[in-house]
Amino acid sequence: MNPNTNFSDLVDKLSTEIKIKEPCKFGTLVRVVGLTLEARGLEAPLGAICEIVGDKNTNKVEAEVVGFQDQVLFLMPFTEPTGINPGATVKIKNPNALAKIGPELLGRVIDANGEPLDGYLTPKCSNLLPLRGIAINPMERGPINKVLDVGVKAINSLLTIGQGQRIGLVAGSGVGKSSLMGMLTRFTKADIVVIGLIGERGREVQAFISESLGPQGLAKSVVIAAPANISPVLRLRATQLSHLIAEYFRDEGKNVLMMIDSLTRVAHAQREVGLAIGEPPTAKGYPPSVFSLLPNLIERAGVGKFGNGSITAVYTVLAENDDTSDPIVDIARASLDGQVILARKLADSAHYPSIDLNGSISRVMQNLVDEETHLIAGKFRRLWSLFQQNEDLIQVGAYKAGTNPELDEAIRLRPAMVSFLQQDMNTPEDFSISISKIKDLINKGPSNQTSQVANPNIKLNQTENSLPQVTNSPDSKSNNNSSAKAASNFNTGNRLIQ
């Protein structure tokens, strides 16, 4: 060594040139019970991604940290832990729950980890963001004061949606939920569409993309698919990723339509995770974490800071056995800004979209439309409900014309109202045209149709699509007398629901 060499300079030089790798921390797999893996000897935060390596490095499984107790980590694997042996090595792969986001995702179909499902290369996104997002101060959110044209006249005119609103689409199975979702996806005037297909059948992913979206719709969309056969933690991760992508484009000033199908499957995934790590079951077996997760997800949608962009969210909610008192339906109603309920009775009579006005509501409609439109929509809903309440009496001819003038009007307008609520799934209806049509219907009555007031000779078909049929038989006079007598015997005036 040169005696003139400064020792401290030499140390500094060596410390910059020699890079010592950080020591890698390992743990050991000690127990596997059902969906849960338990590891000791490793400290990792919740949400961290770990890699479990079996003997001879031949079997590797990724898992997410979902809980811990004392010195034990609880992990949930992304895939079946087949081939993983006792004492397998557990190491941290990604300590933070982060995801790569960017405009490169547009037009792509990806999984819960951002990997492509469409056969193309992995999107090269440069923005690394926390998966659970960053909460917005409620005082900094902009108001919901702009109409969002969804192209479905029943919703545009009677359940008007605003940019940044959160809506629930509540339906049982087989009542046209997917068809209405497709209409909303294609017809809504939004800059970006983010679709999370969570926990549904795998075959529906390709069908939804090809039939409901199409090439033109996919070009401005991002689809995140997590079918029912994958791990519950991946289904939850896909849900978080869907919200994060929507938040990214919202913060870029875009008006985003986000559709999550379905919120019920998200709750099921959280139930699987919660019960597996020992949470106590509550209503319908759901652990408390479910009732915390859903409002947190829903609050991520809405108008951005100071009105900069918006996320209009549509969450489908499965009403099992058409039970609208299900706990998930209840919490969705409490957390959302309105709901659109689909009725099996309407679907069975080929009435599409099968929107049940009696249970559906938009809580911000009165802030979006003028007073006249709001009053017209209210009258339409009132007449629709009044007819349904008295439908049995009308069907059997027990209602006496003139007993209730408003019900007479409901019967007269019923065919036109039924026709107005139906719409071809390939034909959009502009917002202004929808409003104009409903005003004409209520103010002027049905066009090209003889006004009919309820009388005992009118018999409504069981399907609401049909017009009332007037019977003009030679015995109509005697029929009139006998029916009127029957109506009197029934004391219709007292039985009528007003």
What is each model feature region?
Residues 10-17, 91, 150-155, 242, ...:
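Phosphate-interacting basic helix/loop segments used at nucleotide- and nucleic-acid interfaces
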Residues 466-484:
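Long, intrinsically disordered, low-complexity tracts enriched in Ser/Thr with interspersed Pro
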